[in-house]
Amino acid sequence: MKQFLDFLPLVVFFAFYKLYDIYAATSALIVATAIVLIYSWVRYRKVEKMALITFVLVAVFGGLTIFFHNDEFIKWKVTVIYGLFAGALLISQWVMKKPLIQRMLGKELTLPQPVWSKLNLAWAVFFILCGLANIYIAFWLPQNIWVNFKVFGLTALTLIFTLLSGVYIYRHLPQEDKS
């Protein structure tokens, strides 16, 4: 159910874009993201930090898009979010000395420290590359291509990278954890 809720604003954005335009889609994205956040609070009595940050960025960049009637703001939101993700991963590794990936998954998985570090860096690089790809596609290609990339391309890339990360993790699990 939670995964469905995470994708709901994206589905709403895409549907409103196809039915109306980027501004209606942006308005719908803000509303859908707020509804998911409220539902999460009512249902689970907690809101994940990343969900809250995402909502704030959606509201700010989406609000600017609607107010100025300029789609560049909503296009930048994607890169800003990926930049924040990459920054958090890199800071956790180099400043806090414990990779964020390890903090998130360390209770469920036992991996050698170098594996956590490589996985953390791989995700940081992934987010940086996705952010750069977003900039190129958002500002050099037609809007409809950017919307398709945002909805389908980035989702597919994230799924593929998650699967590859799973394979990498599996290869480094202790024998007793593999069964």
UniProtKB/Swiss-Prot annotation:
The keyword Glycoprotein does not apply. The chain crosses the membrane at residues 22-42, 50-70, 76-96, 121-141, 149-169. InterPro entries: YciB (IPR006008). Its main location: membrane. GO terms for cellular component: plasma membrane. It is a multi-pass membrane protein. Plays a role in cell envelope biogenesis, maintenance of cell envelope integrity and membrane homeostasis. HAMAP family: YciB. This is Inner membrane-spanning protein YciB. It comes from Citrobacter koseri (strain ATCC BAA-895 / CDC 4225-83 / SGSC4696).
